[in-house]
Design a protein with these regions (language model features):
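N-terminal helix-cap/turn-to-beta initiation motif at the start of protein domains
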Residues: 23-40
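Bacterial Sec-dependent N-terminal signal peptides
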Residues: 1-23
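Well-ordered beta-strand positions
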Residues: 40-42, 144
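Extracellular structured ligand-interaction cores
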Residues: 36, 47, 66-68, 150, ...
Length: 193
């Protein structure tokens, strides 16, 4: 009888351990360090800047590491957008599902890349003037390091709309019209020293 109790005890302990919600950590590593800093695009009288810093997003399923970013836009010497202030270091979805007010770009790192290479990163962009999907941001864009000093910035609104509404029964994708962006959709930026 004692042996049966010991066996049952170990079975219950094992089941309890296996039933624990193990949180996964995704995207951790230093392969995105090359993105950190301020990047500038200038064309005629337009200046567009973005800044990136490392951060993470915590959810009930785990934590995802990536880049938080801010942006700045001036045209003909007039500042139209200036969201380069302090950025968050953590977005905890267990506390609030609403994205932080000072988060304008979120580019999560992925585990599917070799950690020794710098990956292209998909991103969500929170356009403070156009407010896609009521300010919830729009995916479909990406950033890609072309060289240590050159960065490709690309926003694809049609793809972002598709990702947001595809499969939703409450929204007809043909009725969601593009509204554009307040910043350049495609630009090659240079890293500031």
């Amino acid at each position: 009888m004692r042996r049966i109790n010991i066996i049952l005890y170990f079975i219950l302990i094992s089941v309890g351990i296996l039933a624990q919600n193990s949180k996964k950590i995704k995207g951790a590593g230093n392969n995105i360090n090359a993105y950190i800093g301020t990047w500038v695009y200038q064309s005629n009288d337009t200046i567009f800047k973005i800044v990136f810093q490392k951060g993470k997003k915590i959810s009930p399923y785990g934590e995802t590491h990536g880049l938080y970013g801010g942006y700045y836009l001036s045209v003909k010497g007039e500042v139209l957008e200036d969201y380069m202030g302090p950025l968050p270091t953590c977005w905890n979805l267990e506390i609030s599902t609403t994205h932080p007010d000072n988060m304008y770009i979120w580019a999560p790192n992925s585990d599917s890349y070799d950690k020794s290479t710098v990956p292209a990163l998909g991103m969500s962009f929170y356009d403070k003037r156009k407010k896609h999907f009521n300010g919830e941001g729009i995916s479909g864009g990406y950033i890609k390091l072309l060289s240590p000093k050159k960065l490709l910035w690309h926003l694809d609104e049609k793809k972002g709309i598709w990702w947001e509404v595809e499969g939703r029964e409450d929204t007809d994708i043909t009725k969601v019209l593009p509204i554009g962006f307040s910043v350049p959709e495609y630009a090659i930026l240079t890293k500031e020293e």
